[in-house]
Amino acid sequence: MEAMPSRCLFLLFLSTCKLSPEVVAEVQESSDGPGAQEPMRLTDVQAAMEFIAAAEVAVIGFFQDSEVPAVSLIHSVVQNFQDVSFGISTASEVLAYYNITGNTISLFRLVDNKQLDLKGEDFESMDATKLSRFIESNNLRLVTEYNAITAIGLFNSMIPIHLLLIMNKASSEFEENLHRFQEAAKLFQGRILFILVDSGVKQNEKAISFFKLKMAELPALAIYQTLDDKWDTLPITEVLVEQVQNFCDGFLKGKGLRQNHEAKEKTSKVEL
C-alpha cells in the first residue's frame, strides 16, 4: 500500500490545530517585553556578511532608497522579535552582492543557510501583520520549538530529516537536556532539523501519537524523513550528545528504520 503524501505530519497538523494558549502568551510576551532594539544600518558588504553570520536568524530590508514606507514597517515590528537581528541597507554594492534587484525584505537563517525573500507583489502588498507572519513562520533555529506557527517553516525547509526531542518543558531536567540537544544539533547543521516538542502541551498529543509513543515512554527522540515518511523512535531517560549522534547516524545510514504503510497504522496520520 502506498504511503501518504510526504510531509503529512506537519501539513495536517497545521490544518487541524489552533495556537495553544502557551504559544499565544509567548508571542504576546515577546511583543510586550523590554528592550529598545533598532535595525542596524549596513553600509557595505563586509558589514552585512558579519551581521548575518553572527545571528541564528537575521532580517534585512534591502531598499533602493531610505524613504520607502517599508523602512518604518521594519521599525514597527522590531520589538516583537527580541531574538531576531534586524538590519537595513540601501548600499548598491550590498544589494548587488545578495542579488537584490528591487526593494526586498530578506530573512537569513543559520540552520539551513537559507535566504528567503519578500519581493515584488508580496513586498508591495505587505503590512505589519504579513511581515510578522513571514518572520514567525520562518524563524527556524538550531533547535526550533514545534507549534502551529513554526510548523510552516519546518514544512517549507529544504532539509528533509527532522529530529524531535519530545519532552515536558516543565521537567526539572529540561534545561540541561535542551542544552545537550543544542550541542548535538551543531553536529548535524544543514543535514537534520532539530525540533523540540513540548509533551506538556495538549495540542502536541496528535504529533506524539503519530510516532506510536505513549506518555510513559517519554522523554524520547523521534526522527522523521519527510520525503518518504520513514521514521524511528528512541525512548530515553536523558539527552546525551553521543547517543543523539549515534541515533542520527544510524538513521542516515538506513539502520533501524520504520515505515508506516499498514492501513490500520495510518489512522493517526489521517487524524493529525
Swiss-Prot record:
<dbReference type="Pfam" id="PF13848">
    <property type="entry name" value="Thioredoxin_6"/>
</dbReference>
<keyword id="KW-0325">Glycoprotein</keyword>
<protein>
    <recommendedName>
        <fullName>Endoplasmic reticulum resident protein 27</fullName>
    </recommendedName>
</protein>
<keyword id="KW-0834">Unfolded protein response</keyword>
<dbReference type="GO" id="GO:0005788">
    <property type="term" value="C:endoplasmic reticulum lumen"/>
</dbReference>
<feature type="region of interest" description="PDIA3-binding site">
    <location>
        <begin position="229"/>
        <end position="232"/>
    </location>
</feature>
<feature type="signal peptide">
    <location>
        <begin position="1"/>
        <end position="25"/>
    </location>
</feature>
<comment type="similarity">
    <text>Belongs to the protein disulfide isomerase family.</text>
</comment>
<dbReference type="GO" id="GO:0006986">
    <property type="term" value="P:response to unfolded protein"/>
</dbReference>
<dbReference type="GO" id="GO:0034976">
    <property type="term" value="P:response to endoplasmic reticulum stress"/>
</dbReference>
<comment type="function">
    <text>Specifically binds unfolded proteins and may recruit protein disulfide isomerase PDIA3 to unfolded substrates. Binds protein substrates via a hydrophobic pocket in the C-terminal domain. May play a role in the unfolded stress response.</text>
</comment>
<comment type="subunit">
    <text>Interacts with PDIA3.</text>
</comment>
<dbReference type="InterPro" id="IPR036249">
    <property type="entry name" value="Thioredoxin-like_sf"/>
</dbReference>
<feature type="domain" description="Thioredoxin">
    <location>
        <begin position="38"/>
        <end position="151"/>
    </location>
</feature>
<feature type="glycosylation site" description="N-linked (GlcNAc...) asparagine">
    <location>
        <position position="99"/>
    </location>
</feature>
<keyword id="KW-0732">Signal</keyword>
<dbReference type="GO" id="GO:0006457">
    <property type="term" value="P:protein folding"/>
</dbReference>
<dbReference type="GO" id="GO:0005783">
    <property type="term" value="C:endoplasmic reticulum"/>
</dbReference>
<feature type="short sequence motif" description="Prevents secretion from ER">
    <location>
        <begin position="269"/>
        <end position="272"/>
    </location>
</feature>
<keyword id="KW-0256">Endoplasmic reticulum</keyword>
